[in-house]
C-alpha cells in the first residue's frame, strides 16, 4: 500500500544582484519607491514541501503518491518527479493559475527581496482523498504537509473519517494558524514533525504542554539542525539521534523535507524509531550538501558507507536490506 504525500508543489527562482540594495535607496523618497535591479544570475529549482518529500521517498524506492495543485507550467516538473519514482497521477491541474512560485533576489550583503505567488496551490482545497485511494488503494500513511490551509484541514479530517494513519507536518503554516486549527491538524497524528522553533510556537498557540501533545500523537519528531533529532513518545524516554556530519554544507533549505522522507521510509520498511531517525538524518545531510532541494542523490554504496561511519555496521546492514540500487 502506498504512502500519499499531500503538500505544496512550487518552483524557486533565485537571482543574484552584484551590488547592494541599500545603494539604490534615495533618502527622503522611501514613500515613493520604484526600484529595478539588473541581476547577473538566475537559477530555477524545483521545490515545495510536498514535492520535496515525495522526491526523497522516490529515491528510497517507495513510489509515493503526490497530491497537490499545480498549473499548466508543471509538465517538465512532472516529468522530473516521474523519473525519480514519484506517482503524479493524483495531482490537480489548475486551468487558471500557474504553479506556486518563490522569486528571490539576493545582493552582495545577503540582503534579500522576495515574493511568493501561491497560484494553483489555492486550489488544493478542492482535492478529495477518496478518488486518490480509489486509484492507488488504501494508503499506509498520508503525509499532511504545508499547503493551502483549508486543504490541510480537509485532508486531516478525511484521514480521521476514513481511518487512514497520517503524519502532521504543519511547518511554516504554524506561524499564522490559530490554536484551534493547529489542534485540529495535530490531534490523532501517527507522527508529528516540527523543528525547534515550530515546537515552541505550537505549545504557545495551543496552550498544551509537551506531555499533552504526546498524549495526542504517536510520536513527535523535532529537528534541531546541527544538534540532530529528538524523538518523543508518551511514557518513554526521549530518543536523541545525531546529525550526520556534513562534508560540504551548502544550503540548509530542504533538509527538513529530506529528513522526513528518510524517517517515513524507514518506518514503512519496519525499522525501529531509532533506525528510521538515523536514516532521516543521513538523507537530510545529503540534501543540504547541494544547492536545490531536489538535486541530491543517494548512491547506494557511498550512502551506506557514510551511514555506517555515523551509526555503525549493524545499522548500515539493516538499511542495506531495503535500500534500492
Regions found by a protein language model. Give the residues of each.
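Conserved phosphate-binding/catalytic region of the ribokinase-like
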Residues: 207-325
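Gly/Ala-rich phosphate-binding loop of Rossmann-like dinucleotide-binding domains
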Residues: 58, 160, 268
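Conserved phosphate-binding/catalytic loop of the ribokinase/pfkB sugar-kinase fold
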Residues: 89-94, 102-141, 145-146
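A glycine-rich beta-to-alpha transition motif near the start of alpha/beta enzyme domains, typified by
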Residues: 63-89
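A short acidic, amphipathic alpha-helical/loop segment
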Residues: 150-158, 180-185, 275
